């Protein structure tokens, strides 16, 4: 099929690459978010999807809004049969959805109808899901509510961060997306409506959502930290400054630590929770580089009874 692909961040790159390499499809153009400042110099940078398209000489469209008349006119001129979309990052209105013959097919990183929204991988880890996956579905105006073409499942490992899990899903999801488009093209695949039961939502994770509540049980602390690693990154307040926290380890010992109370040992730094303590891995104080918690603790001269809040 003749395709126009929409996507922006790194997790969308495997899907675009797989479609470029597919013998059954032609990527006529790519739609991505406008170039944005990045890096220390804050220079305007092409999105990862846009950069891959440039490498292959594919036309790149960067509308400020997907409802821009000029963009819609160019999309009609391209005459796509289908528009696959992976983490594009902008709202697509009905005027755009109606253009391709086979609609827009979205790759979403959850087993729909679970975790509709911007942060499905983070939600799966935070809530302790043992199995998650990816779904392909036809876009409709309602958020992630369209009929589903196919799914692929993925185990959530005890050590998975959202970054690690999303990387795996982006690879397996790319294969699912190609298979879905193959099935649409040859007429062998039909979408099925999502069930009314089991709907849940995963809104965008804000910085305040990533603050660790040490009154929660250790397992909840562990899951929260992993769910927001690497973005936006877990944190707590220490001496009235923000301290970023990397993944922690649950310690199966009763040390009598109050929630957030820090205990510095020779080889580890512990913090109390609502249940068992956790051992801190890497931390990053404001204006400092990321470092082992033991190095941070030695430099901070932590006094008995000090806490992470």
UniProtKB/Swiss-Prot annotation:
Show the Pfam families listed in the entry. Formyl_trans_C, Formyl_trans_N
Q: Which branch of life, at top level? A: Bacteria
Q: Where does (6S)-5,6,7,8-tetrahydrofolate bind?
A: 110-113
Q: Does the keyword Secreted apply?
A: no
Recorded E.C. number(s)?
2.1.2.9
> InterPro entries attached here?
Fmt, Formyl_trans_C, Formyl_transf_N, Formyl_transf_N_sf, Formyl_transferase-like_C_sf, Met-tRNA-FMT_C, Met-tRNA-FMT_N
Enzyme class (EC, first level): transferase
Basic and acidic residues composition-biased segments: 298-309
Instruction: Report the GO terms under cellular component.
Output: cytosol
List the SUPFAM superfamilies: FMT C-terminal domain-like (SSF50486), Formyltransferase (SSF53328)
Keyword Cell membrane found: no
Alphabetically ordered keywords of this record: Protein biosynthesis, Transferase
What Gene Ontology terms describe what this protein does at the molecular function level?
Answer: methionyl-tRNA formyltransferase activity
Region Disordered: start-end pairs: 289-309
Quote the catalytic activity from the record: L-methionyl-tRNA(fMet) + (6R)-10-formyltetrahydrofolate = N-formyl-L-methionyl-tRNA(fMet) + (6S)-5,6,7,8-tetrahydrofolate + H(+)
Name the family. Belongs to the Fmt family.
Q: What is this protein called?
A: Methionyl-tRNA formyltransferase
Could you tell me the gene encoding this protein? fmt
């Amino acid at each position: 099929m003749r395709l126009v692909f929409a996507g922006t961040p790194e997790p969308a790159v495997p899907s675009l690459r797989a479609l470029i390499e597919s013998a059954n499809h032609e990527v006529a153009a790519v739609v991505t978010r406008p170039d944005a400042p990045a890096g220390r110099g804050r220079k305007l940078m092409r999105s990862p999807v846009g950069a891959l398209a440039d490498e292959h000489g594919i036309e790149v469209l960067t509308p400020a809004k997907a409802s821009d008349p000029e963009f819609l006119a160019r999309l009609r001129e391209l005459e796509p049969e289908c528009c696959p979309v992976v983490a594009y990052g902008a709202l697509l209105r009905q005027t755009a959805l109606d253009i391709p013959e086979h609609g827009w097919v979205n790759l979403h990183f959850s087993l729909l109808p679970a975790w509709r929204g911007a942060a499905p991988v983070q939600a799966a880890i935070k809530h302790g899901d043992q199995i998650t996956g990816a779904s392909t579905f036809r876009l409709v105006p309602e958020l992630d509510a369209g009929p589903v073409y196919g799914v692929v499942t993925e185990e959530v490992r005890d050590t998975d961060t959202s970054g690690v899990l999303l990387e795996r899903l982006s690879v397996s999801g790319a294969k699912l997306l190609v298979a879905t488009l193959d099935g649409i093209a040859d007429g062998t695949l039909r979408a099925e409506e999502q069930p009314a039961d089991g709907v849940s939502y995963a809104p965008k994770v804000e910085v305040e959502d990533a603050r660790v509540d040490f009154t929660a049980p250790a397992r909840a602390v562990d899951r929260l930290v992993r769910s927001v690693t690497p973005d936006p990154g877990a944190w707590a307040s220490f001496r009235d400054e923000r301290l970023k926290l990397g993944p922690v380890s649950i310690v199966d010992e009763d040390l009598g630590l109050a929630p957030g109370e820090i205990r510095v040992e020779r080889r580890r730094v512990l913090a109390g929770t609502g249940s068992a303590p956790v051992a801190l891995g890497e931390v990053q104080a404001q204006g400092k580089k990321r470092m082992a918690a033991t190095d941070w603790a030695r430099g901070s001269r932590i006094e008995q009874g000090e806490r992470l809040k």
